[in-house]
Amino acid sequence: MPWMETCPVKERMRFVVSLESGLYSMTEACERFGISRVTGYKWWDRFCEGEKWLEDRSRRPQSSPGRTPQEIETLVIELRKAHTTWGPEKLLEVLSRRHPGVQLPARSTTAAILKREGLIEKPRVRRNHRHPGQPFVEAHEPNDLWTADYKGEFKTLDGRYWYPLTIADQESRYLIASEGLLSTRGRWARPVFEKVFHENGLPKAILTDNGPPFAVWNAICGLSALGVWWIQLGIRHYRIEPGKPQQNGRHERMHRTMKAEATRPPGANLRSQRKKLDAFRYEFNEVRPHQALGNKTPAEVWRSSARPYPRKTPKPEYAAHHEKRRVTSVGHIRFKCHMFFLSSNLLGETVALEEIDDGIWSIYYYDVLVARMDERTGEVIS
């Protein structure tokens, strides 16, 4: 008959009463209540002591020689309250400089102090490997923002499929490029962008949708080969929210005009079709006035970028306190005994890691935050 956990006090009282009655020996009473003789003698001795013998006694040791002194805990807590974004390592580093003769607790102990005081909250993170989409981005000057997209699939009269890639300046509406390509793969698109960058310089940012070759669904932050290259060039890559083409509305409107004027009827072959695209681009930029531009043509508003296309791709520069890791040939980095997959398009590249909370690290490629990861679970969080 084991004691009921729901009411241990009553069971202890019944045990003592059975001993006092003289009907049971200690051994018999312990067997009857399903406890050991050691436990039985413990409660009998406490009964003999008198007051409050039924109550549980604290198991806390009388002294804790390893406990962090209260004054040290106070230093940690006060510094954290003054700098709410600092993690344990940064707090300890600053405290060691301010109090060089003081023995400070370990990083894990510091984290425990902060957690006990309610100064660490579990980070709210989006556990999704797909890019969440970027709201519409405003432009105020030419080259603040370029937009790029493919306008579907078309077929020439000789039966060849082709895909129009278009690049436009958001502010001036200038159609920078309209190329008929045989595929939407990045290896076809990159030469178009290289030519445009050589002739016109670099924009501050490029806005695209989430389709290939601009995004890769199974890579962290959707990093495609084009996206990685643009980061290296210092170009911000924004993507519209999935299913919301209206966030790239000006480009979509231009596409409707291009489809009507440059694809109907289709060209006899790809060479003929490209001539039709060139003629449309000239008319759109040089001839057609735009009401939103005060009835000016895009060519009257557009100017080339002052940012030249570099001969050599600049190397990333990271802060001294960052942890650096080289991406393996299969797109992983090794950190804290875990292998984290980022993107096969980053192979051989160096990324930087910065701890932003206890066990939570931000991963940067150049100056772009590409992901966050949890060193405890081994999860990468987009």
Predicted regions and their residues:
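C-terminal, beta-rich DNA-binding module of retroviral/retroelements integrases
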Residues: 285-382
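Mobile genetic element proteins and their domesticated derivatives, centered on retroelements
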Residues: 15, 29, 40-43, 75-76, ...
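Acidic/histidine-rich, metal-coordinating catalytic segments
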Residues: 184, 197-220, 241-243, 248, ...
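Charged alpha-helix within mobile-element recombinases
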Residues: 222, 226-310, 352, 356-357
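Mobile-element integrase/transposase regions
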Residues: 70, 108, 112-168, 172-174, ...
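Short, Lys/Arg-enriched anionic-surface-contact patches
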Residues: 1-14, 62-70
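Short, amphipathic alpha-helical "recognition" segments used to contact nucleic acids or chromatin
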Residues: 7-24, 73-82
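Basic, flexible linker segments flanking DNA-binding modules
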Residues: 51-147, 153, 224-227, 245, ...
